[in-house]
Amino acid sequence: MMHPTIDIKTFLKPGVRAHLAGIGGVSMCPLAEVLLGMGLIVQGSDMTESDTVCQLRAQGIDVAIGHSAENLKDCDLVIRTAAIHDENPEIAGAIARGIPVYERAQAWGAIMQHYENAVCFSGTHGKTTTTSMATHIFMAAQADPTVMIGGTLPMLHAGYRVGKGDTIILESCEYCNSFLNFFPTVAVILNVGEDHLDFFKDLKDIEHSFHAFADLVPQRGYVISNADDQGAREAVAGLSHPVFTFSLADRTADCYARDVAFFDGCASFDVMIHGQLYAHVDLHIPGKHNILNALAAASAAYVLGIPGQAVTRGLEDFHGAGRRFEHKGSYHGAAVYDDYAHH
């Protein structure tokens, strides 16, 4: 794999022509829209027609179906998904012509530097749900965030939105160390466990990656971590940066849940921060783990000055993300759920 010698930030200006290989992907489509909003001329390719492709074309983005070096035209740079390798005709063509090729994560990392607040949710489990919760909270606060989620959020009818506020919220994946291309001002670690062992050597290697991710946060920013998770505790151990912690019941944590009660499997509780009531939450998704997810989202809101009322309202309206224990209906009296369940 060739690594461009020119910083991708050099290209993020009006009039530059960017080609996105795999433009219909879940995190490439919002990337295309953000780049378009920055004044770049955006084009791309994908293997199949889709609603996403039609949506991009409706905004004036030229999308070719199928991959060919001819699709590059006179582009200035190429951005690709992790699934597209050097042997792809567009990537090979770009390399042959000396056109710089960047990874999707590099592009997002450069973009987030244009925002005052870059809130990155990481972890082995719960990223999509917690990023979705945070989106609801920041929307309730009328912060108008830009959002990138690795799943569909019913409120958005998509996995992303392009806002005009000073905050960007991203689901941040550790696979291939992609989140190390990011520039978080708020780095949230939900949990750390064994996963992606086709890339990482072992759990210690994964913890080291999360430690490096947290270490990216500037001194003005915040590292938020799950005090109840051993892997997360190991990941933030030894950081020079202070760590804001959340916990289900540990009252020595910065943020914890009080007076937890369950109704039909869904939790109701108070969010306590530094011993003071910050917000009351009534969840509409089941499971104790979602209390922790809500505490993580609330912690991110708190450190950025979002009022507790927005946490209450935002989570009151949250009924889950697509394919995350998503209730689809019933069949002969049995409840039917759709869950990604890829671990």
What are these language model-derived features?
Residues T52, K73, I111, M155-L156, ...:
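Generic structural signal for helix capping and beta-alpha/helix-loop junctions
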